[in-house]
């Protein structure tokens, strides 16, 4: 792959449920800095939500284990410090945007869905295995050529295609829950 495409930090791809019960796609950055505005994650399946939540928590744990609520460097050294820090974040009512943005900016080249050397959540050098269509990435499909699904959610060409936001969500889900 030669092209860099679909920035997960700025492009909307994480499905969230708003307080009025509508569902909207937001970027990774937006999901973190505006988390207080969302009721829930709203992916295609609960396991997909768990996989996305795992990524969101990994970013938050990394950021706030290194900086305090004011964004000043203060690495956690003891368990009690971690509990106090998360209590302070809870009392604040939102995650401070600047430390999150700073951390994500530092690693922005790792958040491209398509990238020649650092594709998100993928190993470009992996040549072992079998090539599959997009349908194999989609956890809602679960059918084979000889056993089609009785009441499919997707039909025709849409069975073989995923939008970039869908591909990002399913990539996380498959890597979290699909076992060899």
Where are these regions (language model features)?
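Conserved small-residue
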Residues: 1-154, 158-180
């Amino acid at each position: 792959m030669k092209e860099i495409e679909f920035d997960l930090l700025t492009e909307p791809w994480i499905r969230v449920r708003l307080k009025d019960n509508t569902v909207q796609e937001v970027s990774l950055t937006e999901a973190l800095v505006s988390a207080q505005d969302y009721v829930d994650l709203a992916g295609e399946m609960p396991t997909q939500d768990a996989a996305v939540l795992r990524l969101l928590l990994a970013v938050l744990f990394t950021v706030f284990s290194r900086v305090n609520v004011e964004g000043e460097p203060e690495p956690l050294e003891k368990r009690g410090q971690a509990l106090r820090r998360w209590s302070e974040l809870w009392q604040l009512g939102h995650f401070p945007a600047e430390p999150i943005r700073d951390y994500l900016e530092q690693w922005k080249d790792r958040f491209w869905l398509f990238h020649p050397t650092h594709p998100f959540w993928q190993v470009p050098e992996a040549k072992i295995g079998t090539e599959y269509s997009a349908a194999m990435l989609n956890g809602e499909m679960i059918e084979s050529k000889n056993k089609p699904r009785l009441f499919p959610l997707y039909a025709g060409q849409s069975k073989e295609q995923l939008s970039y936001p869908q591909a990002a969500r399913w990539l996380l889900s498959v890597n979290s829950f699909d076992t060899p």
